[in-house]
Each structure stands twice: as structure tokens, then as C-alpha cells.
From Swiss-Prot:
The gene is rpsC. Residues 39-107 form the KH type-2 domain. Keywords: Ribonucleoprotein, Ribosomal protein, RNA-binding, rRNA-binding. Binds the lower part of the 30S subunit head. Binds mRNA in the 70S ribosome, positioning it for translation. CDD domains: KH-II_30S_S3. Residues 214-260 are annotated as: Disordered. This is Small ribosomal subunit protein uS3.
Amino acid sequence: MGQKIHPTGFRLAVTRDWGSRWFASSRDFSKMLHEDLKVRDYLKKRLAHASVGRVVIERPAKNARVTLFSARPGVVIGKKGEDIEALKRDLQKIVGVPVHVNIEEVRKPEIDAKLIADSIAQQLEKRIMFRRAMKRAMQNAMRLGAQGIKIMSSGRLNGAEIARTEWYREGRVPLHTLRANIDYGVSEAQTTYGVIGIKVWVFKGEMLGRNEQPVVAEPEADNRRGRRGAPRNDGGEGRPGRRPARRGDGQGRQEDSRSE
């Protein structure tokens, strides 16, 4: 199941959170959901060159808050903040309420799955070999701290007549483990031969759930009697740890002296 299902949806309410955080009645839900889709489509086209990895939409009382996670925040803000003000006005026309835009910088874009997929798509559109682009992205991700990465490309690769799928993996990518922090991203490359789809899975390590506590191993009790690691022998009917008498030891000599 972990191989086919969406990694983020599979881990919702366990280790991942929703991309839209608001509550609406059944009457207004479809309208607000449609507005969210319009906002995401608009930002995808408007900020295609700004390396935006994730968009979080929140709706407090009678306003909206949009958080952009970008590797190039200066491109989003623009000169003297002109671009960000124009962005707010356009978003307010779509949503119909005042919009606040927050920008969070992505410190390591090389291990962000969405940004990796977008980077590979841009390289494919520039006629770079898909294997070279995929392997270079994997090397950069592993070098900057990712514990595993998997990249899949599908379509008419290198202009082949028959579409096919190729994927590469390096490190661990445990898709069935719910506590695994799996970042997932998808992108499309519009080439002269057709559309090529890119999927990226990045494993950033295991994380604890909301109700989990770290398990601390209790130290083992020291057995100070006898040698360390030596098996204990109760000696049959005697006291625990006492060896039975053998021929030639002290007990045998005492019995011989008594008989004399």
C-alpha cells in the first residue's frame, strides 16, 4: 500500500499536516475549496521562477493568510516590495477578503522534493539528458543530509517512440513506515516530444508522532558474582552457583585423610 498511495495523504494526522487549515460549514465548503484551488494555480503560474516549494493557506476570521516556502524569497518580494504588494491585490480579488502573505525561506532546496522535481523538469525542457539530471539531483540531496531519495521519470524519455518509466534510488526510502519523514513532490516537463512527469521521494529521517515518547532502554543489571559473561551453574542439588565436588579437589583429600 505504501508504494502506491500518496505519501503525504498516507501520513496526514500522524506526522504531516494539511496544506489548507480552515473550517467551513457544509454550505460554504465547496466555495472556499474552489478558491484555494484558484489561489494555488495562480501562484504556480505567477511564481514559476521563484522556486516555491509549498503553499499553506489559512483563513482566520474574515481574512486569509498565505504562507509561501521559497528558496528565492527576494524574487517573490521584488524591488522595494512592489511584487509582494501586487501579489496581495491579485489574491484579494480571488478570495474576496484581505490577504496577508508570509514568506518562509527554504534553507536547503536540494532536499526539498518539490523543488528537486521542478529543477529536473526545467533541465529536461533545456534538452539535458534525464539520467544526468536525475543522478546529479540525487548526489546533491545525499550530500546535504538526506538519508534516501528516489526519483522517477515517465514519458517519451530522450524522444523515444515508446513511452517508458525509469527510476533511480539511493539510500533508504521506507514508504510503509508511518513515522518516516517522507517529502514528496511532482512536476511536469513540457518538451517537444510531449509531457514528461517527474516524481521525487526524499527520506529525511524518522520522526515521533504527536502522542509518542522516545523509548529509553533500561540499563542491564550487573552480575557482580563470578566472571563477567560466564554462565551460572547451580551445581545440581547444592546452592546456586556452587560447583559439585570433583576428583582431586580439596573435598576429596579431606575424605581420604578421615579414612586414614
